[in-house]
């Protein structure tokens, strides 16, 4: 069993437990009653290389990363630093996240929020909207093709943006076929947890021009952002490098300023 398989087994059990408390009809009603979603795709297309800043306590590869007692305070610092989108991990077992974190961040910031989790079915899509998410992560490696296409449609039907994550050219082709408009190329292989920063540069140039391209994993500083920008990234998603920085607001601002500098490569579209 791969690391991804193990995570997905836990997620399915946790979703079933939540659905036993709040059924699908109730979570759909809560999603319908939520304020309209913000346009995350438009935020990512603003001038310069955008930064998606992540609230991340732990990971399967590194274990505990940061003791984030107040995710709202961290998210507010990210927004003050110029982040375009706040990513909030809600997977509990390996990443120590929660839907309560999502709620807290939604109350604290006015920019779009990404629910970062391992989505396995429609319940979680409506759950994300009910808790204030504007964007949802869909991992190609975790989903069959029909489910992927269906979940992209459902995400968009609720006014949210789907960030479709890939790690190989085959997965990128599947994402395009399923109708993805925003594709994240993860340098980390979720089956082995190994990181190869060259992955983005190998996959992104083959994506259609109109696709919004996000580089995920491996950003430790401005040099990494500039390298990803040179390979065609519209934005970078950064978690560990921010929560371990000691000054998250400044760390975000440094990346944002590098992405806005005239010397920074600009995506062609």
From Swiss-Prot:
* Positions of disulphide bridges: none
Gene3D superfamilies from the UniProt entry: Aldolase class I
Q: Which GO terms describe its molecular function?
A: indole-3-glycerol-phosphate synthase activity; phosphoribosylanthranilate isomerase activity
Pathway note = Amino-acid biosynthesis; L-tryptophan biosynthesis; L-tryptophan from chorismate: step 4/5
Could you say which residues form the signal peptide? none
* E.C. no: 4.1.1.48
PROSITE patterns linked: IGPS
Q: Which GO terms describe its biological process?
A: L-tryptophan biosynthetic process
Pfam family name, one? IGPS
Q: Name the chemical reaction catalysed here.
A: 1-(2-carboxyphenylamino)-1-deoxy-D-ribulose 5-phosphate + H(+) = (1S,2R)-1-C-(indol-3-yl)glycerol 3-phosphate + CO2 + H2O
Q: What class of enzyme is it?
A: lyase
Q: Does the keyword Amino-acid biosynthesis apply?
A: yes
Mind telling me which InterPro entries this protein's record contains? Aldolase_TIM, Indole-3-glycerol_P_synth, Indole-3-glycerol_P_synth_dom, Indole-3-GlycerolPSynthase_CS, RibuloseP-bd_barrel
Keywords from the named record: Amino-acid biosynthesis, Aromatic amino acid biosynthesis, Decarboxylase, Lyase, Tryptophan biosynthesis
Similarity field: Belongs to the TrpC family.
What name is this protein filed under? Indole-3-glycerol phosphate synthase
């Amino acid at each position: 069993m791969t690391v991804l398989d193990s995570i997905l087994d836990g997620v399915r059990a946790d979703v079933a437990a939540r659905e036993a408390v709040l059924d699908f009809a109730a979570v759909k009603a809560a999603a319908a009653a939520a304020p309209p979603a913000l346009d995350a795709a438009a935020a990512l297309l603003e001038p310069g290389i955008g930064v998606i800043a992540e609230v991340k306590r732990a990971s399967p590869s590194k274990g505990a990363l940061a003791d984030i007692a107040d995710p709202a305070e961290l998210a507010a610092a990210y927004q003050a630093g110029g982040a375009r989108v706040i990513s909030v991990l809600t997977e509990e077992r390996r990443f120590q996240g929660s839907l309560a974190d999502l709620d807290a961040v939604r109350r604290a910031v006015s920019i779009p929020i990404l629910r970062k989790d391992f989505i396995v079915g429609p319940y979680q899509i409506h759950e994300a909207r009910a808790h204030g998410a504007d964007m949802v992560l869909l991992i190609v490696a975790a989903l069959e093709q029909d489910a992927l296409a269906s979940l992209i449609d459902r995400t968009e039907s609720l006014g949210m943006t789907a960030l479709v994550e890939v790690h190989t050219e085959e997965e990128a082709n599947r994402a395009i076929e399923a109708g993805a408009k925003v594709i994240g190329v993860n340098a980390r292989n979720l089956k082995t947890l190994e990181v190869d920063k060259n992955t983005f540069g190998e996959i992104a140039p083959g994506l259609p021009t109109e696709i919004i391209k996000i580089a995920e994993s491996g950003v430790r500083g401005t040099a990494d952002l500039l390298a990803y920008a040179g390979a065609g990234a519209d934005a970078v998603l950064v978690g560990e490098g921010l929560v371990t920085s000691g000054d998250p607001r400044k760390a975000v601002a440094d990346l944002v300023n590098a992405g806005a500098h005239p010397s920074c490569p600009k995506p062609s579209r």
